């Protein structure tokens, strides 16, 4: 082994605790990078494999009813590869020993070969026997929520008739990886399920013999999805087509794609912070090492070692530290990635997980870490090797000592001598002090981000369902029906109040921009549905014109007072120019609103409603559910409280895991920065502190001088961290914004106190470790003359 290599390993061992602290910060950065990208790659690979093996469709369309021979016309559309027609129906399910209303979607399976597209993966049990009308397959999430196994029995109200069904198999489908009820906001596995049964009995129940009301397609390579959708809409329009959609807007795929986008954002943000802090730590450690070894470096150069040789020596030392951090980070990241992926599997239902930590991710993590570390150490090393040996052998010029700015403000008499020493030392090294503050501040910021999502989601739900939508129950009809149905529901025992509504699917267009959504027709002065602005103040519903959420208005590039083209996707399909009269604020979905009477006039129809929002007496809910099951026109109902409860039960584990990970990673930064700063300060000032001990200062007083500096920097860093954290949270909220939801930048006071508390505890722990070293200073060795 070369002499310089022996020197390098000896120095690494001598400063092993500092090396460990830096390696932990690097490991945190690498871990967050590997965690995010490996989770993303694993889920993407799993999704792609599932889609391919089980023929997930690329275009979807629903309609009223079309004869089966229309399938040939659809297959003839240029760019269409495979076509499958189906019968699908929303039904009410009766679950034994479960009082709440349960909705389901029944989908037909063609006999005897099963589905061509959107095939089902059999988790347990068997497939349906051809010709059987009483057998069904059930989605795994729904089965797990109710403890169903093959052989269990449930009842479905199919077109007004009760049908007993035996569950023969538990399955998963690429079409329902993320399973959410129509009109629902959150997944509720207990109250919404997807079932599959033979086509013949399902078609007979809905007068669909030789007909279909649902069609899915795959496309030929290179085909234009937009062109196929346009031609498909033309084919199915006479049969009550509701407008075809591509895979990108299919609800399950859409939610999963948004989750992938979030992981990409995290992979971009957090590693930069961690590796930036690691770069700073390496800078101060190498700077301290180079200063301490001025004479050694000069001696080496005097004995013939080149600048390049000395430079390579310090580069190797930095590289060894990085390698330690990268290796630990890869292991940490892989473990966190697997845990994260398995956590996502609880929400997104895949049949298996193809977990992978790819070579590009590993190489990328190593290269980025090494680059950041070398950049951090570069200045100090170049400064060391550039000095002539004769100059480097001289001791460094003593630092300039003068009163601190605070002392010159007239408060000198109020400060003790040790306190003045602390302030002077901080001011004498402004760059190092500032970088320490920034490093600690970033740990506060990361902690705030970890807690922010919980704060924001709670706020989002509170605003959406506490201020905007205040119903207890949303009852949805099979199809638009007479206003008289509203009074029928009001007369149910336990119903205290109700507001009718109308839903109409539309394409909204402004110039070259368009967006597919639904206009919700509501009553002026509605008690249960309120339009609100960004200040949570009510916005009056205009008698005429359209009201849009601000997000949708931005997507369309339209402002209040301008005209929007409204293309209705059902009924007579009118196309109208409607003025935008107001903008409202919502966190969930993208909605358009109109006065219900004005919407019915736009449709050219009578006084129709699509459903009713109800305020109910909780004591009568079970009776209300039973009554609703007896009304044929009712497609189902949504209990808002149950949906919210189910959402938090599902998301609670995810939010908790995320908070724990962020706490661990942020704690590593705080400890790494504080400990290294304290150790370097101790190394630089050991002679000074030892001199004070010899002069009669007690251990506590000497510790105060050193640790007081760290305490001041930490206390200054915390409010700076609050500013960084709020900015980072605002960026995350903006980056995660989509048509599915907008996360508000809401940070609870408890988040500030928690973030500050964790950083303070981390600082105290680091301080106590350094305090032990101060207490055991070797006064004789430290005071020996270096020359």
List each model region and its residues.
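Short cytosolic juxtamembrane segments of multi-pass membrane proteins
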Residues: 2, 387-404, 775-787
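C-terminal transmembrane helical bundles of large multi-pass transporters
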Residues: 501, 609-616, 625-734, 738-745, ...
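Membrane transport/envelope proteins' first extracytoplasmic loop
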Residues: 1-276, 288, 307, 464, ...
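Juxtamembrane segments of multi-pass membrane proteins
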Residues: 52, 58-64, 417-543, 547-551, ...
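N-terminal Sec/SRP start-transfer signal
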Residues: 1-34, 289, 306, 315, ...
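Interfacial "coupling" helices/loops that link adjacent transmembrane helices in transporter permeases
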Residues: 15, 264, 280-320, 672-714
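Small-residue-rich transmembrane alpha-helices
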Residues: 276, 280-288, 295-298, 319-351, ...
């Amino acid at each position: 082994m070369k002499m310089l290599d022996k020197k390098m390993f000896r120095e690494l061992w001598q400063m092993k605790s500092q090396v460990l602290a830096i390696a932990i910060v690097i490991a945190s950065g690498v871990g967050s990078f590997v965690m995010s990208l490996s989770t993303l790659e694993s889920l993407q690979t799993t999704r792609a494999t599932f889609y391919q093996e089980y023929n997930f469709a690329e275009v979807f369309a629903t309609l009223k009813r079309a004869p089966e021979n229309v399938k040939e016309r659809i297959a003839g559309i240029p760019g269409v590869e495979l076509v499958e027609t189906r019968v699908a129906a929303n039904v009410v399910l009766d679950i034994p020993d479960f009082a709440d209303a349960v909705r389901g979607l029944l989908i037909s399976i063609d006999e005897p070969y099963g589905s061509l597209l959107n095939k089902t993966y059999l988790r347990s049990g068997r497939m349906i026997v051809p010709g059987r009308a009483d057998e069904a397959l059930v989605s795994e999430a729904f089965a797990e929520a109710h403890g169903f196994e093959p052989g269990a029995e449930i009842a479905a109200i199919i077109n007004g008739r009760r049908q007993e069904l035996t569950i023969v198999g538990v399955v998963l489908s690429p079409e329902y990886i993320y399973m959410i009820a129509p009109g629902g906001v959150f997944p509720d596995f207990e109250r919404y399920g997807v079932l599959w049964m033979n086509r013949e009995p399902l078609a007979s129940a809905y007068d669909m013999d030789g007909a279909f009301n649902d069609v899915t397609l795959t496309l030929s390579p290179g085909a234009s999805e937009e062109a196929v959708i346009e031609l498909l809409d033309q084919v199915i329009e006479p049969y009550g087509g509701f407008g075809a959609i591509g895979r990108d807007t299919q609800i399950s795929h859409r939610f999963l794609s948004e989750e992938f986008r979030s992981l990409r954002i995290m992979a971009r943000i957090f590693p930069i912070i961690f590796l930036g802090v690691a770069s700073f730590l390496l800078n101060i450690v190498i700077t301290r090492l180079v200063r301490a070894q001025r004479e050694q470096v000069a001696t080496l150069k005097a004995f013939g070692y080149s600048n390049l040789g000395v430079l390579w020596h310090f580069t190797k030392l930095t590289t060894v530290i990085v390698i330690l951090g990268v290796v630990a980070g890869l292991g940490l990241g892989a473990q966190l990635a697997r845990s994260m992926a398995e956590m996502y599997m609880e929400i997104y239902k895949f049949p298996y997980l193809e977990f992978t930590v790819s070579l590009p991710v590993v190489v990328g993590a190593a290269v980025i870490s090494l680059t950041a570390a070398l950049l951090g150490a570069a200045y100090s090393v170049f400064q060391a090797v550039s000095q002539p040996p004769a100059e480097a052998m001289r001791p460094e010029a003593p630092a300039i000592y003068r009163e601190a700015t605070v002392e010159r403000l007239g408060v000198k008499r109020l400060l003790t001598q040790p306190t003045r020493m602390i302030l002077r030392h901080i001011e004498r090294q402004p760059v190092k002090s500032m970088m320490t503050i920034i490093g600690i501040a970033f740990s506060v910021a990361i902690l705030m981000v970890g807690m922010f999502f919980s704060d924001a989601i709670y706020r989002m739900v509170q605003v959406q369902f506490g201020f905007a939508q205040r119903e207890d129950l949303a009852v949805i009809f099979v199809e638009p029906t007479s206003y008289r149905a509203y009074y029928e529901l009001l007369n149910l025992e336990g119903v205290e109040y109700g507001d009718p509504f109308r839903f109409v699917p539309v394409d909204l267009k402004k110039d070259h921009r368009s967006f597919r959504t639904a206009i919700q027709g509501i009553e002026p002065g509605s008690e249960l549905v309120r339009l609100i602005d960004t200040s949570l103040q009510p916005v009056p519903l205009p008698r005429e014109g359209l009201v849009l959420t601000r997000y949708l208005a931005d997507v369309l590039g339209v402002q209040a007072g301008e005209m929007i083209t409204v293309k209705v996707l059902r009924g007579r399909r009118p196309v109208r120019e409607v003025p935008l009269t107001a903008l409202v604020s919502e966190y969930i979905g993208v909605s358009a609103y109109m006065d219900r009477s004005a919407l019915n006039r736009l449709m050219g129809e009578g006084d129709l409603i699509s459903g009713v929002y109800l305020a109910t007496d909780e004591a009568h809910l079970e009776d209300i559910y039973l009554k609703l099951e007896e009304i044929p026109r009712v497609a189902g109902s949504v209990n808002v409280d149950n949906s919210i409860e189910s959402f938090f039960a599902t998301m609670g584990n995810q939010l908790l895991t995320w908070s724990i990970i962020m706490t661990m990673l942020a704690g590593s930064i705080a400890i790494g920065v504080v400990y290294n700063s304290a150790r370097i300060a101790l190394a630089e000032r050991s002679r000074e502190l030892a001199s004070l001990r010899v002069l009669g200062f007690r251990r506590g007083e000497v510790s105060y001088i050193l640790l007081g500096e760290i305490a001041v920097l930490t206390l200054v860093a915390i409010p700076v961290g609050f500013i960084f954290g709020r900015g980072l949270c605002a960026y995350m909220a903006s980056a995660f914004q989509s048509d599915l939801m907008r996360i508000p930048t809401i940070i609870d006071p408890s988040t500030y106190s928690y973030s500050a508390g964790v950083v303070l505890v981390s600082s105290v722990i680091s301080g106590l470790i350094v305090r032990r070293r101060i207490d055991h200073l070797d006064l004789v060795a430290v005071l020996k003359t270096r020359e």
